[in-house]
């Protein structure tokens, strides 16, 4: 398992830059979620690893943890096939898969940049990606690809047990990475 990038470790999480939201009456901000552990799950609707592993994991986290202590946020971050993964397609996907957690749509500033704004700010390598943000708003874990439920649960539990001012390492033990293909069973890389 790849650890949080050194440049991002324990830094304040960049605010989410979105063009819209689903499953929430108001746009969410990380500032409004201070005091909670934030689980940010990024995905694309045509990413096999997202559909098979990442999204079901986000649903399990949302079901198992107290929403007053843990906020699960999905971020639809499209870096390929933009014409078929717009808001309408996402709304159908969210309905069909019965996703209940809030989902932001990563803001895309056109083909010149290629990668959406939040994905770029977090230096993500592809989808699915998992980011854990502590109660003070700092990035504590950042990983491209699938992370086991046990490792994620361990990390969330460690963050929940911290006092607001503490910042200990919550990275679970390392395992092997993904293959070299752009899309495999773990996700789609840039």
Question: Which residues make up each language-model segment?
Answer:
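Proline-centered helix-kink/hinge sites
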Residues: 14, 48-49, 56, 102, ...
């Amino acid at each position: 398992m790849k650890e949080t990038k050194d440049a991002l470790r324990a830094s304040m999480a960049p605010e989410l830059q979105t063009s819209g939201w689903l499953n929430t009456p108001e746009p969410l901000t990380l500032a409004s979620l201070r005091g909670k552990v934030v689980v940010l799950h990024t995905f694309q609707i045509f990413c096999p690893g997202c559909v098979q592993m990442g999204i079901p994991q986000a649903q399990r986290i949302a079901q198992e943890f107290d929403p007053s202590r843990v906020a699960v946020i999905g971020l639809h971050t499209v870096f390929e096939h933009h014409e078929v993964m717009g808001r309408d397609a996402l709304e159908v996907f969210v309905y069909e898969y019965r996703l209940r957690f809030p989902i932001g749509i990563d803001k895309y500033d056109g083909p010149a940049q290629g990668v959406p704004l939040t994905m770029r700010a977090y230096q993500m390598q592809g989808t699915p990606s998992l980011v854990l943000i502590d109660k003070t708003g700092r990035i504590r874990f950042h990983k491209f690809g699938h992370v086991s439920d046990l490792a994620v649960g361990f990390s969330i539990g460690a963050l929940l047990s911290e006092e607001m001012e503490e910042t200990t390492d919550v990275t679970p033990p390392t395992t092997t990475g993904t293959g070299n293909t752009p899309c495999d069973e773990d996700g789609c890389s840039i």
